[in-house]
Amino acid sequence: MSIATTFGTANTSGTIKAMLLGCGELGKEVAIELQRYGIEVIGVDRYPNAPAMQIAHRFHVINMLDAKALKAVIELEKPDLVIPEIEAIATQTLVELEQQGLHVVPTANAAKLTMDREGIRRLAAETLAIPTSKYFFCDTLAEFEQAVTDIGIPCVVKPVMSSSGKGQSVIKSTQTIQQAWAYAQEGGRAGKGRVIVEAFIPFDYEITLLTISAVNGIHFCDPIGHRQEDGDYRESWQPQSMSAEVLHKAQAMSQRVVEALGGYGLFGVELFIRGDEVYFSEVSPRPHDTGLVTLISQDLSEFALHVRAILGLPISNIVQHGPSASAVILAEGTSTNIRYQGMAAALAPADTQLRLFGKPDIDGRRRLGVALARDNSVEQAVEKAKTVASHIKVLF
């Protein structure tokens, strides 16, 4: 990959242009960090006024699964960097354009492999022989029912391509098998299709290990613990307490996956921990939602680290500020005029912060912001973050 040695100014002929494919809350923070280096940011997403579009220099609204539309917008803008921030992208187009010289972050192959759960699971389990849960991929209800029989109950069901827990469920009895299939078909980002059935690992806890591949080597953030509900994270905290031996195993496993994917950038590696055993779950070649806690827990957030790495800049050290937590601000309703109250009360306690994402609308349940807190212990930080979040009243 080519590394920039000269940085220009946005909206001038000498600028470095970065195109964000996906303009949600994570993309918004990446855009902010890019602009700190004078990078010209072009946002692309499937709906207008997405969070990162609100601060990008300009934006385009397209269906990013449409290969023709994706190629057209890239050829129009001629970006120096293309930064996928979501999975639902025509990644084969990125692979083809990369072969013609386009710089995709971290690589087009990484984006393609992690676009769905099948590519990355087969890489980890079959190519790298990394421990994972037992799994089957299914295209039909008959295959699905056979997979559930072979794996046993309880088992976990997910669309091969989805995000934020959409379409995910745990089968706990034979009565819910068809319901789980139907829910997975509804929740896929690219519509109905293939699902993965996984054995349920009775893990002690799960972590996100933010792993950065930079010009000066591999770097790790302290492990992040998190609590899931309905397949989506509700709170995350850093550091997650774990033994030095298990942490070393987790880091070694994460490094193998990241190096196999290639390129520079930050990767969110999800792992299950049971006793002294570590199991690979998933990886995203970009900042991770549970890593929002790093906005308050570290001197360099996951977004700052991602941008440093993709620009070819070195990472010298990462300072962790102590027990920290995030708690999501979740709302349910229908509105195109979302407003908020309770900000003053929310931010009254010491060592607290708030991020409202700027989502333009809501139709159902949606994550609209995140509360951040530091305290003397992880447990106290989690409770403080939850209290901060509880003060925010969403008006529709």
From Swiss-Prot:
Tree of life domain: Bacteria
Class of this enzyme: ligase
Pathway linked to the protein: Purine metabolism; IMP biosynthesis via de novo pathway; N(2)-formyl-N(1)-(5-phospho-D-ribosyl)glycinamide from N(1)-(5-phospho-D-ribosyl)glycinamide (formate route): step 1/1
PROSITE patterns tied to this protein: ATP_GRASP
GO CC term (a single one): cytosol
MF annotations from Gene Ontology: ATP binding; magnesium ion binding; phosphoribosylglycinamide formyltransferase 2 activity; phosphoribosylglycinamide formyltransferase activity
Residue positions binding N(1)-(5-phospho-beta-D-ribosyl)glycinamide: E25, L26, E85, D289, K359, R366, R367
GO biological process, one term: 'de novo' IMP biosynthetic process
NCBIfam families referenced in this protein's UniProt entry, alphabetically: PRK09288.1 (NF006766), purT (TIGR01142)
Main function: Involved in the de novo purine biosynthesis. Catalyzes the transfer of formate to 5-phospho-ribosyl-glycinamide (GAR), producing 5-phospho-ribosyl-N-formylglycinamide (FGAR). Formate is provided by PurU via hydrolysis of 10-formyl-tetrahydrofolate.
Quaternary context: Homodimer.
Protein name, per record: Formate-dependent phosphoribosylglycinamide formyltransferase
Gene name linked to the record: purT
